[in-house]
Amino acid sequence: MAKIIGIDLGTTNSCVSVMEGGEPVVIPNAEGSRTTPSVVSFQANGERLIGQVAKRQAITNPEKTIISIKRYMGTDHKVNIDSTEYTPQQISAMVLQKLKADAEAYLGEKVTQAVITVPAYFNDSQRQATKDAGKIAGLEVLRIINEPTAASLAYGLDKMDTNEKILVYDLGGGTFDVSILELGDGVFEVKATNGDTKLGGDDFDQKLIDYIAETFKAENGIDLRNDKMAIQRLKEAAEKAKIELSSATQTNINLPFITADATGPKHIDMNLTRAKFNELTHDLVQRTLEPIKKSLEGSGYAMSDIDKIIMVGGSTRIPAVQDAVKDFTGKELSKGVNPDEVVAMGAAIQAGVLTGEVKDVLLLDVTPLTLGIETFGGVSTTLIEKNTTIPTRKSQVFSTAADGQTSVEIHVVQGERSMAADNKTLGRFTLSGIAPAPRGIPQIEVTFDIDANGIVNVSAKDKGTGKEANITITASTNLTDDEIEKAVNEAKKFEAEDKKRKESIEVKNNADQIVYQTEKTLTDLGDKVSAEDKATIEEKVKAVKDVKEGEDLEAIKKATEDLTQTFYGISSKIYQQANPEGAQGAGFDPNNMGGANADNASAGNDKKDDNVVDADFKVEDDK
């Protein structure tokens, strides 16, 4: 059976995992890291960079580098690059394509299906947008799963025989969630969830950026926030300082030549203490405490009922965050999970549940926000309360507001406010063909159906005439089927172009390497090579150099192969002449270009360096 991957599509970093031998395993990316920056960059030559390589060049290419696109999922936000507009779904799809490609390279097989995580407090539009991104990337998204729920799966997989109530505190790069779950006998039941989709590590970085910029402005009269390249350097420095202050009490921010004026270049060289960082970000930390309180209220539990607190997301490494949660809850924090990887691992476990690889696990999640329709007077009438276990279905009968009314518009909203206008509009549809009657007489049954992904379907039926209308909620910010199809084709085109560009680089690098090795070996052999053979080789070298600057890859491959075979034949002849009784000898091997010299090229490749030790990440396990 084909593997289903689990993906944590994060605001700042993403991670991919898969089940192997009944356990979730994090898949390293092509660069060797276990997480991939959710960064996309477009180059002047049309090349597209994704992940760490895109993040590295953000300073020199700030206008065409896209970060934290997840914050715009489910909105009508567009990114304009070279007069081409990209939706958040398309940019996210590019990150997903990178994760998909890394998974395929690791597994050695095609990957077409995935479970993708979203913040628990994502609304319907944001969930739909995430599914669309997966489709554009060439993935069938079998399930959308909430991030805190995924984390609880990874935490509780080896604790199936225990009964625990856990609180998952998930502070990522751009979003924040709190979920209360009950674990017991393989059942993972979410009792309540709350959060803020506009709060995360990016906001902590921004506090530092503003502080550094304001300090610099006070000293030099220049606002660095008006300079895109300078602001990108500030972002990088702020993130680095934040990370360093998690383990040190002071850090130095040194940015030479940050800008210049008539008096010359300007530099930043300042020390930042953890105490100052805590002061700057105190309000952000405090904002995370109210959702804890609301989640407890929604679950019906007291803090004393909670057995474990699981900290998820890179931003939970901030000491002030840990201290605030400990002080607020009065409990020690669990150290049994890796906050950067646990969500992806949970997604892989859910994938294992879907394939049957993981047995005796039942996941019961909830809808994070109240769902209802607008009724007379603009009131929001609730059909499904927040924290209702999904999947679920709920019906309610309504009537007309005017005499002789033959159609009604169903306005579907999501949110906690009493007036429909103050809530998030999920969609509108019309039920027509109602038999004319005095107001209040027709009976119109409205049914809400939420699937396991948290995605909403709404139907309305006139019980008198049997007329029916329904809608799968797709807000105006979501893509139509045609738009998705177009985006899929564009993604395939990008993928093909990237593949061709990569092949071109590899072919040209190989040609360069063989030319270098040939010329070096030719020099080393000296007068052992006849003038005639030397002329033949030099002619073949010139042929490679002539074609390798072009784009005809087949011509480069042919010229390289000709050079390889010609030199191999000549070098073999030389070694045979030097050792007529011996075998072929360790001549120039065109298939082994890794050695620094000919003597080492064909030997010792399998020998392990005794000075190299394998490193592994170890987390403390809670028993």
From Swiss-Prot:
Residues 591-604 have a biased composition (Low complexity). The keyword Nucleotide-binding applies. Residues 605-623 have a biased composition (Basic and acidic residues). It comes from the Bacteria. Residues 580-623 are annotated as: Disordered. One of its GO terms (molecular function) is ATP-dependent protein folding chaperone. PROSITE patterns: HSP70_1, HSP70_2, HSP70_3. The keyword Metal-binding does not apply. CDD domains: ASKHA_NBD_HSP70_DnaK-like. Pfam families: HSP70. Induction: By stress conditions e.g. heat shock. Keywords: ATP-binding, Chaperone, Nucleotide-binding, Phosphoprotein, Stress response. The modification Phosphothreonine is found at T175. InterPro entries: ATPase_NBD, Chaperone_DnaK, Heat_shock_70_CS, HSP70_C_sf, HSP70_peptide-bd_sf, Hsp_70_fam. SUPFAM superfamilies: Actin-like ATPase domain (SSF53067), Heat shock protein 70kD (HSP70), C-terminal subdomain (SSF100934), Heat shock protein 70kD (HSP70), peptide-binding domain (SSF100920). Belongs to the heat shock protein 70 family. Acts as a chaperone. HAMAP family: DnaK. This is Chaperone protein DnaK.
